[in-house]
């Protein structure tokens, strides 16, 4: 019986604590097969009773004072007890310094590989059991963007010696700061032009992201303008004294500013260049390249078009810079007259550039027009050289319309896209300006939207609406248009009213010449007050005497009868309408000025 009991208790010493493992090898591994039961009982009895000398325990007693582990815990191995040290000569790179694999993939033409590279960035290794705080720490460290490169914004007075600064007046310091701002702006412009060539044009040409013809169309002759601005910078540098001051700059500007006419071709091509660039951005390779450049420090968080538009924005700053220099120049200074001449020169240059750009923009949109019917073609459209206004409005049915107001005709279109080419489909018949009638509609006069449910709903009525139509209702055409807000409505009113004013003032009835103006006290004796008054009289008469006929009536079969009825109503309502307008004008009340 005793040998069987000893055999059953044989694996128990294995489950003892580590303190018990310090015994002899024989005690730790258990007795051998030839060990007798009496020897085992004696040894175990002495070990168990060594901690308690006041009694002699039996063979079934266990005083290890340790919890008993379950049988399934015997096979559990703790990683903390293993020696996992790396070799001392192994190179280990910290995880935070490992670059994303997607960033290491160079731009390729294969779309599948490119999508793979984009997908890698969204992977998350869930086997990492770090705490959320540590994970957030690593992610924030790896996603910190590279800081953008900033330019020095130091003023001229900050770089001046203290003793020199005390010897100059406040006005002279401000004059020198204005001159320094002009020279510093020229330096920044030169750097941006070189950067556009080096960081955008040349890499895209080398990587075949765009063809040479496309790049020439987008960038233009950007390189030819770098020597132009370097020449001005050199002249200002030669005129600068050792102490950093510039005595005279007027003669330099008078001789240099006319050379800015070289920008006429570049500015005229900007609209077409912007359209081509937007079209090429649909190419994933182009978009990926531009996005990489945008995230680089050299771009200063500016996209490619911002660099291409810098010359135009620089041109419009020259008058402001010259006026600032003139403002702080003493009247007895020889630069006064020269600066005034320079301001006139730059204004003339900008006027010529704007005229050329307007003609190019006008022709660009004319080429984008598509006609559904040959009757829509009008020779006044092809002969247009000036585009007065253009933009998006909504029709009465809620559809988006794009309106072009040329100097002689107004064209309503619908934007369409065919084969990735944007164009404008002419909608209805174009309206010549001399036949155009503009009507102001108050908020809520017309319900917008063509749905059946909207006709019976109590929804908010339309705002910022007006109506345009033919003066002769025989073409059976009228358009109720809605602007986005009051500001855009006012802009459209001013533009359309200025276009139709010469025709309305010439054809105004003689009996309406005595109609007083609503705000005569605001006009005074201004030279253009009479012309403006005549325009407002004609437009006011048109808004007062016209009867609002629903535009759907023009499309029905009885259009001629409706026109005759409207004419009869006009004859009966003309005199009362004029009388009411005259009474309100003479009352002197706080009445808002009518837009039309």
Curated annotation (Swiss-Prot):
Tell me, using the record's free text, what induces this protein: By TGFB1. Up-regulated by DNA damaging agents like H(2)O(2) or ionizing radiation (IR).
According to the record, the segments passing through the membrane are none
Tell me a Gene Ontology molecular-function term this record carries: guanyl-nucleotide exchange factor activity
The organism's place on the tree of life at top rank: Eukaryota
Motif interval(s): Nuclear localization signal: 12-19, 66-72
Q: What is the effect of changing residue 202 to N?
A: In a breast cancer sample; somatic mutation
Q: Name one GO cellular component term.
A: cytosol
Please list the tissues where expression of this protein has been recorded. Widely expressed.
Query: Modified residue Phosphoserine is at which positions?
Result: 21, 32, 100, 106, 122, 508
Q: Name one GO biological process term.
A: positive regulation of Rho protein signal transduction
Q: Where is this region: Necessary for nuclear localization?
A: 1-74
**KW Iron (keyword) present:** no
Query: Which keywords has UniProt assigned to this entry?
Result: Acetylation, Cytoplasm, Guanine-nucleotide releasing factor, Nucleus, Phosphoprotein, Proto-oncogene
CDD domains the UniProt entry points to = PH_Net1, RhoGEF
**What is the recorded function of this protein according to its Swiss-Prot or TrEMBL entry?**
Acts as a guanine nucleotide exchange factor (GEF) for RhoA GTPase. May be involved in activation of the SAPK/JNK pathway Stimulates genotoxic stress-induced RHOB activity in breast cancer cells leading to their cell death.
Identification of the protein by name = Neuroepithelial cell-transforming gene 1 protein
- Lineage of the species this protein comes from: Eukaryota, Metazoa, Chordata, Craniata, Vertebrata
Q: Which gene encodes it?
A: NET1
